[in-house]
Amino acid sequence: MFNNHLHLTPFIHIDDFQQIRINGPFELTVLSPHSCQLSGNGYILIIESENTLISSMNVEEVIINVQELKRLELRKMEIV
């Protein structure tokens, strides 16, 4: 039997370090006008720049525009 449900593969696409596109299940937290954090699938992505702007967001994807990227960190969540 063929199952035609769409299963999105999480990915991070970085375009010239000015636009970051993230796909997959995640939770977005805006920490300040300069930084945001995405968490999901056991990982945390931290983005810091001079200006961090959420330009587009829907259930499956977020597009973040940054100016003068200062920090882009992907780390595994600590499971306690």
Where are these regions (language model features)?
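N-terminal intrinsically disordered, cationic/polar leader segments
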Residues: F2-V80
